[in-house]
């Protein structure tokens, strides 16, 4: 008969007690060891981390404005450079 029953079910320690209660006790002991309260996050030190903390974590729309201004400035710079190179050729 013991060859048909898996070893975990047929163990002597589980025969006299409720296995569900033992499993629940393991879960309770695991969760009781976890820290409680607010999680503390390390402060950002890099410029990108500070930017993310200031604008992205607060849900601000400023990064969209910053990105559009950046692309506008880069586009203007490229147009100006290639316009000057066009004048050198002619």
Swiss-Prot record:
Its main location: mitochondrion. Pfam families: F1F0-ATPsyn_F (PF10791). Transmembrane segments: none annotated. InterPro entries: ATP_synth_F0_fsu_mt_fun. GO terms for cellular component: mitochondrial inner membrane; proton-transporting ATP synthase complex. It is found in: Mitochondrion inner membrane. GO terms for molecular function: proton-transporting ATP synthase activity, rotational mechanism. Keywords: ATP synthesis, CF(0), Hydrogen ion transport, Ion transport, Membrane, Mitochondrion, Mitochondrion inner membrane, Transport. It comes from the Eukaryota. F-type ATP synthases have 2 components, the catalytic core F(1) and the membrane-embedded component F(0), linked together by a central stalk and a peripheral stalk. The central stalk, also called rotor shaft, is often seen as part of F(1). The peripheral stalk is seen as part of F(0). F(0) contains the membrane channel next to the rotor. F-type ATP synthases form dimers but each monomer functions independently in ATP generation. Mitochondrial membrane ATP synthase (F(1)F(0) ATP synthase or Complex V) produces ATP from ADP in the presence of a proton gradient across the membrane which is generated by electron transport complexes of the respiratory chain. F-type ATP synthases consist of two structural domains, F(1) - containing the extramembraneous catalytic core, and F(0) - containing the membrane proton channel, linked together by a central stalk and a peripheral stalk. Belongs to the ATPase F chain family. This is ATP synthase subunit f, mitochondrial. It comes from Pichia angusta. The gene is ATP17.
């Amino acid at each position: 008969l013991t060859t048909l029953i898996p070893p975990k079910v047929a163990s002597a320690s589980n025969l006299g007690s409720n296995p569900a209660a033992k499993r629940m006790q393991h879960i309770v002991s695991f969760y009781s060891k976890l820290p409680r309260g607010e999680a503390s996050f390390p402060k950002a030190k890099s410029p990108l981390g500070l930017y993310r903390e200031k604008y992205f974590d607060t849900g601000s729309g400023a990064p969209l404005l910053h990105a559009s201004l950046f692309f506008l400035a880069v586009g203007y710079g490229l147009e100006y450079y290639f316009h000057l190179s066009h004048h050198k050729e002619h």
